[in-house]
């Protein structure tokens, strides 16, 4: 633990995490990429937060970052249609206020231009049997290990 955070930061974290799960619930066959982004955007912006637009979720497969790109904003019913067999990294990135970012001189670190906190949660999912299955959870690992011993 790195210390306590303010109630405002706790709410930012809670809202960002909630938006991740709302997006995951949206990721079913027949829906579209815009539906995922809309779920994140609507939930976060309705509470006054900003949505990072420079970084997005993505497909994942033989390589870490594959198409399609999955923005955390969007219009319902737009974008590529979701199908069984797709593996996606959904990763809401949400700011306390302004969504504008600044790249640090090291070309790795990124901060918000207004220097206020931001939050990022991520899960990798596989769409199959008509629903999104979360792959990046320790529950899955526990189930696999349980079968090994």
Question: Where are the predicted features?
Answer:
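Active-site neighborhoods and metal-handling regions in enzymes and metal-associated proteins
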Residues: 1-149
């Amino acid at each position: 633990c790195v210390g306590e955070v303010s109630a405002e930061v706790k709410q930012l974290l809670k809202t960002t995490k909630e938006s991740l799960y709302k997006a995951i619930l949206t990721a079913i066959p027949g829906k579209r990429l815009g539906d995922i982004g809309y779920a994140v955007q609507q939930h976060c912006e309705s509470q006054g937060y900003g949505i990072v637009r420079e970084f997005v979720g993505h497909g994942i497969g033989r390589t870490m970052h594959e198409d399609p790109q999955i923005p955390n904003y969007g219009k319902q019913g737009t974008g590529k249609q979701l199908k069984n067999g797709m593996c996606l990294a959904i990763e809401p990135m949400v700011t306390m206020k302004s969504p504008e970012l600044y790249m640090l001189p090291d070309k790795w670190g990124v901060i918000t231009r207004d220097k206020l906190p931001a939050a990022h949660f991520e899960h990798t999912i596989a769409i199959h049997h008509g629903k999104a299955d979360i792959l990046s959870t320790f529950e899955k690992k526990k189930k696999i290990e349980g079968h090994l011993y």
